[in-house]
Every structure is written in structure tokens, then in C-alpha cells.
């Protein structure tokens, strides 16, 4: 099964990265791609993914959180091979060069020889885009402060205890009857299925449905989805399940979704709007 997700987010505190968990399991080999804008990093990785698919192999596509039409990485689970854009804001280096990683420099195909006039123009563009990003992060930070001000804090110890009992009962019903609940290997245990991008707010709801036939949607009008999702993750792991934690891009300390592919069950916040999801209020 092919899949797509994000490993970076434009958050209230700036760029937030989960790339440290990409292609780092025993036996994995990661090629870090270097090169400036326009050198074809995304297209190169897309061709790799398509070639793998043409040979009947699954591919995991890492979408760029700023521009979801662009790729920042691709991983072929059957081959334990990954390729990643290792340039800012998610600078990555091979852990042990030549053993579990190497480089490809697409910058060598750049057409150089620009004039001083071009240099000045490019510098102006870089200054402007840094300024725009700083402003955007400031707005996101302000939004999070407002969220904290208007959402009531109703989830104390007693409420969380009641919520835990309810979620534990739901998870017991989701758990396979044959007891097949062992924690299997999951590539990128933490990821994002939600981004604040140049195309606006984007939820990869279809990716959650691919992995989990049964979806529970946590209505978040009172701000309890984060607490419920963290409890669901704790309880599922205590039962031996392999869990994927999806963080909120604006505030990565919050959970956005918890997926349990081995049980084909998932819990999501109400922003995903998945038709047919069972609501937990």
C-alpha cells in the first residue's frame, strides 16, 4: 500500500521537524539529496517512487509541508531504501557515510554564471521570503494564544479518568479477537497528516482511511481531543499495539490523530471530517 504524509510543519514556534525518524531502522540506507531550488530534487524522488510502484513495490511519499505538490522524501519499505531532500529547513546528513547513507548533489547541474544584477535580485527575494515566513510564524503564534484563551480547561484528573475508561473499552472492542496485537515495525512512528501550506490548511484524511477502516472522530469543541488522543495512544501501546502518532502542525505538542494500523482502527480530531466516522463527544 502506498502512503503519503508530512514530516515537517510550519508551527507557532517556526519549522518543526520529525525527519530524525526517517529511514533510520536497522538495515535502512538513506541517500541525502543536496542542491538549491529548481535542481529537480522532488522530480528525482517522484521518479524513484514511480519506478518502485511499476515493479510492484509500495512507496511512502513525504510531502513538503510548505508546498504539498512537492516531495521532500520517498521510502521503499521492501528495499529499506530512502531518499530525502537534505536542504534547509530540514538539513539532514548521513549518520555513517558509506555504511547507512550517502549523498547525491543535484546542484552540480545548476546553470551558473549569473550577473551581479541577478545576484542582487536573488538576495532581495531571499530577504523577502524570510520576512514573510517570520510574519507567518508570528500569526500562527498569535492564533495559538487565542485558542488557549477561548477553549475552556475542563479536563482535570476526574474527567481524564472517566475518558480513559471509555477509550479503554473502545480499544478492547477494536483489538483483534485472535490476540494479534503485538507491536510491529512502523516506519516513522511520528508524523503529520495535517499541514498549514501555501494551499491553505490541508488534511490527508484519505491516508488515515487507508490504514484504518474504523475511525473514531473526537469532537473538540471543548478542547478535549488532545487529551483523549494521548490517552488512546497510551492505552493502545499498553495493550501491545503499534501506534502512529500524528501531531498538530500549528502546535506539535498536541496530538491530531492516533492510528493503529494493525487493528485497522484510528482516532482523529474533528478537523479531518471523515465521512462515516464514529463520533466521541
Regions found by a protein language model. Give the residues of each.
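A generic N-terminal leader/anchor concept
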Residues: 1-54
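N-terminal pre-Walker A segment at the start of P-loop NTPase domains
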Residues: 1-22, 161-207
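Conserved nucleotide-sensing/catalytic segment adjacent to the nucleotide-binding pocket
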Residues: 1-14, 49-116, 120-121, 234-281
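Extended intrinsically disordered terminal tails
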Residues: 19-20, 64, 148-150, 154-157, ...
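Generic recognition of cysteine residues
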Residues: 23-24, 64, 143, 160, ...
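Residue-level preference for short coil/turn positions at secondary-structure junctions
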Residues: 26-27, 211-212, 263
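Glycine-rich phosphate-binding P-loop
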Residues: 30-49, 201-236
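An accessory alpha-helical subdomain
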Residues: 121-177
